[in-house]
C-alpha cells in the first residue's frame, strides 16, 4: 500500500529540479505516491523528460504561486493564496495526502501550516524538532527556531512531543528526556529552565534532568528541549563546526604525499563519516504540534535530501504521531506515556 505525500515543487533554492528528481527517487525506493505541487505547465514537460518513459506514481497538483526564500513570511502567507505550500497543506487538511514536505522558506512554511492545519488541541505552540546525528543514533533537539520566546509550559509540551517522536518514529524504548541548560544540577540555568524543570519532572517520562551542550552530540540523551532561540543558535553553530571540520580534513589530507596515500587507504571510512553527518540523509525537520504531518527541509536540499524528506513524512504518517499526540494532550496529564 502506497502512502500519499504532497511535495512542494517550488521549495528548494534550485527548484524544481531537485524536487522532480527526489520524487522519482522516492517512488523508486519507497512505498509512496508523490503529489508534486506547483505550476502544471512548467512541471509537466520537466517531469516527462526526467521520467524518460518510466511509469511511476507521481501526479502534478497545480498551484499558480511560489513563495520565495527572501519573502517576508507573514506577507507571503497572507497574499499568496494559491502558493504551492498552501495548496500542498490543504491536501493534508482535506486528508487527500498523509503528509507534506517542503524545502522552502521555513518561516512561511511554519506560518502556512499553523494557518491551514491549525495547532493540535491543547498545544500552545508547535515546535521544530531536529534529529541530530550522534554515535549511538539521532538525538531530538526542539525547538530549533519556531518559538524564540517561550514559557515553562511550552518546554513541558515540547518534552511530550519530542518523546513521542523518538518513541514512535525512531523506535527508541523509553527515550531519555533532558532540558538544555548551563549545568546538570536542578537549580542551574535561567528562569525558563528552572521553572520548566519541575513541570517536566512531574510527567511520566524518562526525565534525566538538565543536560549541557556537549550532550547534544554524545548520545547520552534522546530528547533535549529548549526555546527556539537557544535551539537555533545550537543548530547554526553545529552547521558551522561541521563545515569547518570538513574543510580542515580536506586541507590536511592534501597537505603531503603521505597524507594523500593515507586518505586513499581510508576512503571507505571517510565516506562513512561523510554519510553519517550528511544533512541530506536526515531529510527534514518535522513541525510538531500541528494537525497534520508537515516536514520542512533545508533550502540547499538535493534530490537525495528531497527523497529522505518524503521518507520522513511517510514515516510520521505511518507511525500515527499526530493522532497519538492529540489523544495525549486531550487526556489527563498522568496518561502521557
UniProtKB/Swiss-Prot annotation:
Do you know which NCBIfam families this protein is assigned to? plsX (TIGR00182)
Coiled coil residues, start to end = none
Which lineage is the organism of this entry classified under, starting from the top rank?
A: Bacteria, Pseudomonadati, Acidobacteriota, Terriglobia, Terriglobales
This one is known as: Phosphate acyltransferase
Quaternary structure per UniProt?
A: Homodimer. Probably interacts with PlsY.
Do you know which Pfam families this protein is assigned to? Answer: FA_synthesis (PF02504)
Q: What is the source species?
A: Acidobacterium capsulatum (strain ATCC 51196 / DSM 11244 / BCRC 80197 / JCM 7670 / NBRC 15755 / NCIMB 13165 / 161)
Q: Can you name one GO molecular function term for this protein? A: phosphate:acyl-[acyl carrier protein] acyltransferase activity
Q: Does the keyword Cell membrane apply?
A: no
Q: Cite a single GO BP annotation.
A: phospholipid biosynthetic process
Protein EC? 2.3.1.274
Enzyme class, spelled out: transferase
The UniProt family comment states:
Belongs to the PlsX family.
Query: What is catalysed by this protein?
Result: a fatty acyl-[ACP] + phosphate = an acyl phosphate + holo-[ACP]
- Subcellular location, record wording: Cytoplasm
* Pathway where this protein functions: Lipid metabolism; phospholipid metabolism
User: What is the gene name?
Assistant: plsX
Q: Which key words tag this protein in UniProt?
A: Cytoplasm, Lipid biosynthesis, Lipid metabolism, Phospholipid biosynthesis, Phospholipid metabolism, Transferase
GO CC terms of this entry: cytoplasm
Function recorded in the entry: Catalyzes the reversible formation of acyl-phosphate (acyl-PO(4)) from acyl-[acyl-carrier-protein] (acyl-ACP). This enzyme utilizes acyl-ACP as fatty acyl donor, but not acyl-CoA.
Amino acid at each position: 500500500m502506497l502512502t500519499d505525500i504532497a511535495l512542494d515543487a517550488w521549495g528548494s533554492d534550485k527548484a524544481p529540479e531537485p524536487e522532480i528528481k527526489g520524487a522519482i527517487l522516492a517512488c523508486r525506493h519507497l512505498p509512496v505516491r508523490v503529489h508534486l505541487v506547483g505550476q502544471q505547465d512548467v512541471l509537466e514537460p520537466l517531469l516527462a523528460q526526467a521520467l524518460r518513459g518510466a511509469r511511476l506514481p507521481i501526479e502534478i497538483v497545480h498551484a499558480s504561486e511560489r513563495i520565495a526564500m527572501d519573502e517576508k513570511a507573514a506577507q507571503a502567507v497572507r497574499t499568496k493564496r494559491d502558493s504551492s505550500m498552501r495548496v500542498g497543506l490543504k491536501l493534508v487538511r482535506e486528508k487527500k495526502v498523509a503528509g507534506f514536505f517542503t524545502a522552502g522558506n521555513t518561516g512561511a512554511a511554519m506560518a502556512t501550516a499553523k494557518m491551514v492545519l491549525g495547532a493540535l488541541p491543547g498545544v500552545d505552540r508547535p515546535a521544530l524538532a531536529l534529529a541530530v546525528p550522534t554515535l549511538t543514533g539521532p538525538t531530538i533537539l526542539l525547538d530549533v527556531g519556531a518559538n524564540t520566546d517561550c514559557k515553562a509550559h511550552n518546554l513541558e509540551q515540547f518534552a511530550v512531543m519530542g518523546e513521542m517522536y523518538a518513541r514512535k518514529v525512531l523506535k527508541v524504548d523509553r527515550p531519555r528526556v533532558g532540558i538544555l541548560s548551563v549545568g546538570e544540577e536542578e537549580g542551574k540555568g535561567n528562569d525558563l529552565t528552572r521553572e520548566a524543570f519541575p513541570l517536566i519532572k512531574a510527567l511520566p517520562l524518562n526525565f534525566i534532568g538538565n543536560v549541557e551542550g556537549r550532550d547534544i552530540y554524545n548520545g547520552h540523551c534522546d530528547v533535549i528541549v529548549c526555546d527556539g532561540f537557544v535551539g537555533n543558535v545550537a543548530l547554526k553553530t553545529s552547521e558551522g563546526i561541521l563545515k569547518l571540520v570538513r574543510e580542515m580534513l580536506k586541507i590536511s589530507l592534501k597537505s603531503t604525499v603521505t597524507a594523500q596515500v593515507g586518505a586513499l587507504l581510508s576512503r571507505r571510512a571517510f565516506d562513512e563519516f561523510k554519510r553519517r553527518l550528511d544533512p541530506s540523509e536526515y531529510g527534514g525537520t518535522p513541525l510538531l504540534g500541528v494537525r497534520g504531518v508537515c516536514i520542512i527541509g533545508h533550502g540547499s536540499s538535493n534530490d537525495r535530501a528531497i527523497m529522505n524528506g518524503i521518507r520522513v513524512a511517510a514515516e510520521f504518517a505511518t507511525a500515527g504521531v499526530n493522532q497519538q499526540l492529540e489523544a495525549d494532550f486531550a487526556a489527563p496529564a498522568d496518561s502521557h506515556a
